Amino acid sequence: MRILEKAPAKINLSLDVHGKRPDGYHEVEMVMTTIDLADRLELTELDKDEIRVSSHNRFVPDDQRNLAYQAAKLLKTRFGIQKGVSIVITKTIPVAAGLAGGSSDAAAALRGLNRLWKLNLTLDELAELGAEIGSDVSFCVHGGTALATGRGEKLKHIATPPHCWVILAKPVIGVSTAEVYRQYDASKVEHPNVERMIEAIEAKDYKEMCGSLGNVLESVTLKMYPEVDMIKRQMKRFGADAVLMSGSGPTVFGLIQYESKVQRIYNGLRGFCDQVYAVRMIGEQNALD
């Protein structure tokens, strides 16, 4: 039997980080939404009791470092599954980009294996399991648009944002999330108004949504990696309505309301960055098929 699953990327429309918890994680408050840039997973049952992960992308690990591998191992262990599986990942989401590509692959593996192995788990149950793999996996199991709190695993689903285009640009650098968090000081940054963002989304107010974008990690990453700031400035210069770094970076996204502007901004950014994408904001929970 073969199962196909879609694994969409996400962006943070608002990202606030508070104090460090006793377990070493930070308390976060984030508004996240899915976009139609997605990996594809093909899951096939094997006769041999083993987990095989493969991808055409050489930067994707094929062992226990891979979050999709961890998802399969978790389900096998938790439910006593004595079957093997092959997981083939076709990557479209850039690796280590702040777009939750690995987390979304893990979430897709959980959903796909739930069907393949007929576990009959609900999405909420899969999301609970996903939290054991990574902070973003719970959100990625559901997709859509949500307020995430705790370390990212506590979700409150909210309305779909106003429809718009999203331009993404990833510079050819890697960002150490651990180092960004190490240098982050909650007392020295301007914190976004997360509630204002939620209200703008609920009201389908595009202008207010653009004005409410915020990411407390941005100032830290911009100091460490000037290339990210350059992309932000270029994206604004080419006409994006609002611009923000996603997650801990290095990917920058811009929101564009009208399709007529998208190609011009895309073409302009291609002169500065190889990895540029023009996609739509999905933001709906039923958009994973």
Curated annotation (Swiss-Prot):
GO process terms (BP): isopentenyl diphosphate biosynthetic process, methylerythritol 4-phosphate pathway; terpenoid biosynthetic process
Source organism, top-level taxon: Bacteria
Active site: 10, 136
Enzyme class: transferase
Pfam families: GHMP_kinases_C (PF08544), GHMP_kinases_N (PF00288)
Ribosomal protein keyword on record: no
A GO term, aspect molecular function: ATP binding
UniProt-annotated binding residues for ATP: 94-104
PANTHER family: 4-DIPHOSPHOCYTIDYL-2-C-METHYL-D-ERYTHRITOL KINASE, CHLOROPLASTIC
Family affiliation: Belongs to the GHMP kinase family. IspE subfamily.
Designated name of the protein: 4-diphosphocytidyl-2-C-methyl-D-erythritol kinase
Native source species: Bacillus pumilus (strain SAFR-032)
Lineage, uppermost ranks: Bacteria, Bacillati, Bacillota, Bacilli, Bacillales
